[in-house]
A protein has these predicted regions:
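Residue-level recognition of the GNAT/N-acetyltransferase active site
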Residues: 62, 80, 84, 113
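Conserved GNAT acetyl-CoA-binding A-motif
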Residues: 100-111
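Conserved beta-strand-loop-alpha-helix junction that forms the acyl-donor binding cleft
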Residues: 109-119, 136-138
């Protein structure tokens, strides 16, 4: 069991994990992965066991002009449906906490769709709190 930076060879596994989260399939995933992997303010991580990717997480660091520390945002986080409740999500979350502390972030944020009740319970157990209000303006 290991956590490592994703490579482009992980694209198909990540596409399958995104599909489990109800994201539509897209031919752009590999290209977007390359963009993320070349961004110094982002990490694309995978959890691998016996040569199989069974979880992934995208972490983005956001610089803050008004505060000393940056903040970290979990943009995507998925564990294979067949591998849930085995500590994989916890291992990935603990790994990003270490990255955020190393970067001197003052918080980690995560946006999680309201229909993902099991994910909410996971985040609450890890110490996350609901902090309203999150406003979104579609632009495309």
């Amino acid at each position: 069991m290991s956590i490592r930076k994703a490579t482009l060879d992980d694209a198909n596994a990540i596409k399958q994990l995104l599909k489990q989260l109800d994201y539509p399939p897209g031919n752009f995933v590999r290209k977007k992965m390359s963009v993320v992997m070349n961004n110094p303010n982002a990490f694309l991580l995978v959890h691998e066991e016996a040569g199989t990717v069974n979880g992934f997480l995208q972490l983005d660091f956001v610089p803050q002009v008004a505060l000393r520390g940056d903040f970290a945002r979990i943009s995507y986080f998925a564990v294979d449906q067949q591998a849930r409740s085995k500590g994989i999500g916890l291992a990935l979350e603990q790994y990003v906490v270490k990255l955020a502390k190393k970067r001197k972030c003052d918080r980690i944020e995560v946006h999680c769709h309201e229909r993902r009740k099991a994910a909410h319970r996971f985040y609450y157990r890890q110490g996350y709190k609901e902090v309203p209000k999150y406003l979104v303006k579609p632009v495309g």
